[in-house]
């Protein structure tokens, strides 16, 4: 990728599944100081960007929300991305997603029909939209699954990505999780800490979690734990230059154990400390710690 088309940290294109939280995302970004243009058809995006970043415009950070209600949405948006790249801008594409069950529950709660439902069922509309958006999801820089996220959770995630003072480096989002709850969907790397002994089976350690010293000390002292961390840190450092060259500035790493309470939590805490000590921009979260 040439220098003229590096990722533009001041420009976000927000799209994704209807009901996945586009409006909540727009509101959160406004609170973070972004100028948000909502429900903009793809054919108007390039012009909006040109006007917003003209010399006499006061706008410094622009987020544009667009959805499938426009005709040939995926094709038009792909064309827009090409035109923006040609013009020297590479926006961060944020794709919001959720499970079918979560989307159906949200539509039922507000008693709304899906924009692509037509005369069919709500599921028909969701299926149609997923098919239409497949290519856009594949091109997204960030895929954010909102299934189990409250509005407050969503805002915290957006803060991690878009409220940082330094947007010139790759930001690593590290999270722990429990495999019994399913792996996260919005990740770039997935690692398994279940090869380590489980503190759950020690009656003295069972009341504690991976953020507590007794469990953390136990996990990190196990054979293989330090080598595991060394390999992860080395892997991340080895791929950062490539991600930066490709204009990918947000990378999600997930480390799992059985329940997401002990081993993965301790490993993620230590990994975050090591990366931060190395000067890497890193965020930390524990998805299943309170389950």
UniProtKB/Swiss-Prot annotation:
Pfam families (UniProt xref): PapZ_C, RapZ-like_N
GO terms of molecular function: ATP binding; GTP binding
InterPro entries reported in the protein's UniProt record: P-loop_NTPase (IPR027417), RapZ-like (IPR005337), RapZ-like_N (IPR053930), RapZ_C (IPR053931)
Positions annotated to bind ATP: 16-23
Free-text function comment from the UniProt entry: Displays ATPase and GTPase activities.
HAMAP family: RapZ_like (MF_00636)
Record's protein name: Nucleotide-binding protein jk1004
């Amino acid at each position: 990728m040439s220098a003229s088309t590096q990722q533009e940290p001041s420009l976000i294109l927000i799209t994704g599944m209807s009901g996945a939280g586009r409006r909540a995302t727009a509101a959160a970004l406004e609170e973070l100081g972004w100028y948000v243009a909502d429900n903009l058809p793809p054919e108007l995006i390039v012009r909006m960007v040109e006007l917003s970043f003209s010399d006499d415009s006061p706008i410094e950070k622009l987020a544009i929300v667009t959805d499938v209600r426009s005709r040939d949405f995926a094709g038009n948006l792909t064309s827009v991305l090409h035109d923006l790249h040609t013009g020297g801008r590479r926006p961060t594409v944020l794709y919001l997603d959720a499970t079918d069950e979560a989307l159906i529950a949200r539509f039922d709660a507000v008693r709304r029909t899906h924009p692509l439902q037509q005369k069919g069922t709500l599921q028909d509309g969701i299926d149609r939209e997923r098919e239409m958006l497949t290519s856009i999801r594949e091109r997204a820089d960030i895929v954010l699954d909102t299934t189990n996220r409250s509005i407050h959770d969503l805002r915290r995630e957006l803060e991690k990505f878009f409220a940082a003072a330094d947007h010139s480096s790759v930001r690593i989002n590290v999270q722990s999780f429990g495999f019994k709850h399913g792996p996260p969907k919005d990740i770039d790397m997935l690692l398994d800490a279940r090869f380590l002994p489980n503190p759950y089976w020690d009656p003295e350690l069972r009341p504690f979690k991976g953020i507590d010293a007794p469990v953390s000390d136990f996990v990190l002292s196990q054979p293989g734990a330090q080598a595991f961390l060394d390999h992860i840190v080395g892997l991340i450092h080895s791929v950062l230059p490539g991600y930066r060259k490709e204009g990918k500035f947000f990378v999600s790493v997930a480390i799992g154990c059985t329940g997401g309470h002990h081993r993965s939590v301790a490993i993620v805490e230590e990994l975050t400390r090591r990366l931060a000590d190395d000067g890497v921009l890193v965020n930390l979260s524990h998805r299943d710690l309170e389950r």
